[in-house]
Amino acid sequence: MAKQTLLLSPPSLSSQPGKLNETLQSYNRNATDLQMLDRLALGLASLPDSTYSTIVILAGGDNSFSESLKLINRQTFNQIIGSLRRGGYIYGQDAVSGVAFDHNEAILAGLIHVGNGKYLKPDIEEMQAVPLRLGRKNDHLAGAPSLEGSAAEHPFPPEVSEGKTASGDNRVAVVGSQKFRENIVSAATMDNNEASDDELINEDNLLDDSELSAPIIQPPECRPKAGKRRRACKDCTCGLAQKLQEEDAVKRADADEQLDAMKLLHDDLAEVDFTVRGKVGSCGNCSLGDAFRCEGCPFIGLPAFQPGEEVRLLNNDVQL
């Protein structure tokens, strides 16, 4: 395949036809193409894929690559590299100091720096998928998927018996038969089953009765201080919180039981009618209170009331 060369020119060089023609004379015009960088950057022109063995970026009218660095972005650079053959080179114009494109972009595009500002596109073969042939599993294994095809489609190496080899040397014979593979699979399956059985632990056998009946050891921070009620930690794990809850439940149940025992029915209430004249103190100040009542007043201990007011006794409490 003939070598093709691509010259990439910045727009400022086209304004100097004499300098551009002088540059073109140093290349074979039959195997050289010229393309403007600004047209590639704007998407007005495109390059063929894997066509050129050499790509040269020309300097601008000021004999520098400042204009090329502005025009060659990542998208444009990838398009340029796509037109370069594998094993081809890309570099800036000779005898011009400076960098024609970004070094990092060249590395990211897969180029290799070979020195003197030249970058090589490595000749890497395309990746191909390699099929892997798997051995046929044992048919008696439960749940093992069977491979399609007969044994002829998946041949195994011939079996080599133990003992002396064809040369007469007493060496260990290599066995590659299907029987040997099946034995290995069966042994591995049995080992896995035994290992899984050994891992099972009965939780009821972890603690015996003596350990369950042992007293709870409280941490120092959970121990009650003198004169204060014990308080459980927020994340208590020593059993103090559960014990305090049980004590509170017992106290609440006792209080409810006592409250039910103290309840009186309507028949248990005693009514006192003060409109009926009964015992009257000699002082006549029975309704004023104990401060005004005499020593033998029948209303001692009762609060002050209005004359003729009805007084009820409920749970040993006076209700007016």
UniProtKB/Swiss-Prot annotation:
Cofactors required: [2Fe-2S] cluster; [4Fe-4S] cluster
InterPro entries attached to this UniProt entry: Anamorsin, CIAPIN1, Dre2_N
Binding-site positions, [2Fe-2S] cluster: 222, 233, 236, 238
Source species, domain of life: Eukaryota
Keyword Mitochondrion: yes
Motif annotated as Cx2C motif 1, chain positions: 283-286
Region (N-terminal SAM-like domain) residue spans: 1-130
Keyword annotations of the record: 2Fe-2S, 4Fe-4S, Cytoplasm, Iron, Iron-sulfur, Metal-binding, Mitochondrion
Region (Linker): 131-213
Binding site for [4Fe-4S] cluster: 283, 286, 294, 297
Xref: Pfam families: CIAPIN1 (PF05093), DRE2_N (PF16803)
Region entry Fe-S binding site B, spans: 283-297
Swiss-Prot/TrEMBL GO biological process terms: iron-sulfur cluster assembly
Family: Belongs to the anamorsin family.
Quaternary structure, from the entry: Monomer. Interacts with tah18. Interacts with mia40.
Function, in words: Component of the cytosolic iron-sulfur (Fe-S) protein assembly (CIA) machinery required for the maturation of extramitochondrial Fe-S proteins. Part of an electron transfer chain functioning in an early step of cytosolic Fe-S biogenesis, facilitating the de novo assembly of a [4Fe-4S] cluster on the scaffold complex cfd1-nbp35. Electrons are transferred to dre2 from NADPH via the FAD- and FMN-containing protein tah18.
Alphabetical list of PANTHER family matching this protein: ANAMORSIN
Protein name: Fe-S cluster assembly protein dre2
